[in-house]
């Protein structure tokens, strides 16, 4: 299980009741096919329609999330149970592009050169004997509604919009070829909405792993030209609205398996600008996007590394503080690292954008301290001055590197950090 937003599962991960392996989404299906994660006995796949055809085959039309369904149908040793969910109706038929990547070695290229280019079929075709049972349901999806944008997320969105405008002005991004990816969560949803509302950002395409509520609004308004995704992660009310107005989305919306939506080869070829959310960023540009204080799992890395490592321009966004200001999102040293400095191009908070491209370690530190919350800038500056006494290309004081985290765990507020305690 490489990614989950379920609160009960998150508790189980952190309590050790469920063994959880954090994995890039692009690798999940391939590792299953190679047998690295063991044998799959049974599979459960949701569908909106089944069509029996000649030769003892069945066409399975999937619903709003594809994941690794094609691989499950092929690999489940005992077979697959299909949940035939009438709630979805037949609205999504024709929206999918189902294709399984060849396994190594010397596999063929995945020839997608445009976000809406199709290379597969709109269904999964399987032998009828592989379907061991059909369960009829009529249940809406369980995804929650996004929280409303805040002043902080609007400011972050405005800063990212200005940063994109600056890049387009200099020819680093072509206005007529802007393709965005956006990560999961209310913050990412709000930032993408702010970009869509900005006059500085031209109409754009989306190629991403998950599509949330704001991109669908932008499709209706014509700001998003097309959107390719692996899943529609929206509330049942919003999904019902999509189904009722499917003609507005057909031809502009495409659903793919996760190994295609997150395929590094395609991401690099399309020249995507990635937008993902950071839990914390250290002063040299490393990003933690999964573990609170280095230990407690949030949701998993998902596809953020797939996009960050292969995007033409990779941006991470975060509010400068959390927990009513008691936690700084910019710290001396990340308590866990998911994305190293080598792949992180820019960090955006409500106080600005730190463009890290072409900067040495000390220049990165200056740029990132400048966009930290004002309450934390002197604290971070004090650490940086302390670390520089040790010299080196990337100055650190290992006794003090996690002092802000330690102070929060002991006193409940990073602002109470006293560097003298760590000398």
Model-derived features: where do they sit?
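Conserved alpha/beta enzyme-core scaffold
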Residues: 1-423
């Amino acid at each position: 299980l490489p990614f989950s937003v379920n609160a009960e599962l998150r508790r189980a991960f952190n309590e050790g009741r469920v063994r959880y392996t954090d994995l890039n989404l692009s690798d999940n299906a391939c590792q299953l096919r190679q047998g690295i994660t063991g044998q799959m006995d049974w599979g459960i796949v949701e569908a909106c329609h089944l069509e029996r055809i000649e030769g003892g085959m069945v066409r399975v039309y999937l619903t709003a999330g594809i994941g690794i369904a094609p691989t499950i149908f092929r690999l489940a040793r005992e077979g697959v149970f299909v949940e035939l969910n009438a709630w979805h109706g037949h609205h999504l038929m024709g929206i999918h592009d189902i294709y399984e990547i060849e396994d190594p070695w010397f596999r063929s290229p995945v020839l997608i050169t445009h976000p809406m280019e199709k290379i597969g079929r709109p269904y999964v075709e399987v032998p009828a004997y592989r379907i061991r049972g059909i369960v009829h349901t009529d249940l809406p999806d369980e995804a929650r509604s996004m929280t409303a944008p805040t002043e902080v997320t609007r400011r972050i969105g405005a800063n990212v919009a200005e940063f994109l405008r600056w890049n387009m002005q200099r020819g680093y991004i072509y206005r007529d070829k802007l393709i965005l990816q956006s990560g999961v969560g209310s913050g990412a949803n709000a930032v993408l909405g702010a970009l869509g509302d900005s006059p500085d950002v031209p109409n754009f395409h989306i190629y991403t792993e998950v599509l949330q509520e704001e991109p669908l609004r932008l499709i209706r308004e014509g700001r998003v030209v097309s959107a390719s995704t692996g899943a529609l992660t929206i509330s049942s009310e919003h999904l019902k609205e999509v189904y009722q107005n499917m003609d507005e989305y057909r031809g502009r919306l495409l659903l793919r398996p996760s190994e295609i939506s997150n395929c590094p080869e395609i991401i690099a070829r399309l020249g995507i600008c990635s937008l993902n959310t950071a839990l914390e960023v250290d002063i040299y540009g490393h990003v933690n996007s999964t573990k609170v204080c280095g230990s407690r799992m949030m949701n998993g890395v998902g596809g953020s590394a797939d996009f960050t490592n292969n995007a033409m321009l990779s941006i991470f966004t975060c509010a400068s503080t959390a927990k009513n200001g008691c936690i700084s999102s910019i710290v001396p040293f990340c308590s866990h690292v998911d994305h190293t400095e080598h792949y992180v191009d820019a960090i955006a908070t409500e106080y600005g954008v730190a463009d890290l491209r072409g900067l040495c370690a000390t220049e990165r530190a200056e740029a990132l301290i400048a966009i930290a919350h004002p309450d934390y800038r002197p604290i971070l500056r004090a650490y940086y001055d302390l670390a520089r006494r040790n010299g080196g290309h990337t100055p650190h004081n290992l006794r003090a590197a996690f002092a802000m985290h330690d102070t929060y765990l002991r006193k409940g507020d990073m602002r109470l950090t006293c560097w003298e305690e760590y000398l």
